[in-house]
Amino acid sequence: MKFGVIVFPGSNCDHDAYHVISKHVGQPVDFIWHRETDLSTYDAVILPGGFAYGDYLRAGALARFSPVMNSVKKFADSGRFVLGICNGFQILCEAGLLPGALIRNRDLHFICEHIHVRVETSDSPYTNELQKGMVLRIPIAHAEGNYICDDSTLAELQREDRIVFRYCESDGSITAAANPNGSRDNIAGICSRERNVLGLMPHPERACEDLLGSSDGRDIFRSLAATVAAAV
């Protein structure tokens, strides 16, 4: 089993993701520069948070054209696992690997705080060790985290059980007040139709040690590792 963390110019959460896979998941992991095109030795890749290409034009819009992204698409099409965190989620949407888009936060300013998300499904490689309805405390840090999609896309996501995380209160209730950025239907994370691609705006890699305020994100990575182990 081997993980890769893709590094774009402007990525700043790549070392956090590397640390989690190495220390808390206990698996080999490499940094993958955005100009690389060979992902054949990896079982799962992570597109980390940050500001790829300075978020010029809009978040993820330039990164989608990096040489590595054609390989990421083929990687996902082959059934292997792709996790996009924050800026990584934005890039996955821009690249067409996930539906919808991430736009400016409702209040038009950068948000950096701990929030709560509810696990909406345990039927995914990233949540199969979590229980549906479980509440996780995970930080967010973004200016463009407002998830939008049209009515048909939302209906499809709901029908196919592809909404993986939703913003919630600490007791798990879904409210407008718990929605930090205006995301439609309080959506915090979604997966692809094949369920092997996940994008989420919260930062689980920053919630893997109690010293940092929460270890709730650790089981997301451990779920993925268990799924990869069963697949290889």
Task: Put a short name on every predicted segment.
Residues 1-85, 93-99, 105-111, 118, ...:
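N-terminal beta1-alpha1 cap of cysteine-dependent amidohydrolase-like domains
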Residues 88-89, 123:
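Short, flexible active-site-adjacent loop segments at beta-strand->alpha-helix junctions, enriched
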Residues 73-77, 102-232:
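Amide-donor transfer/coupling interface in amidating biosynthetic enzymes
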Residues 50-51, 88, 143, 204:
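Active-site metal-binding loops of divalent metal-dependent hydrolases
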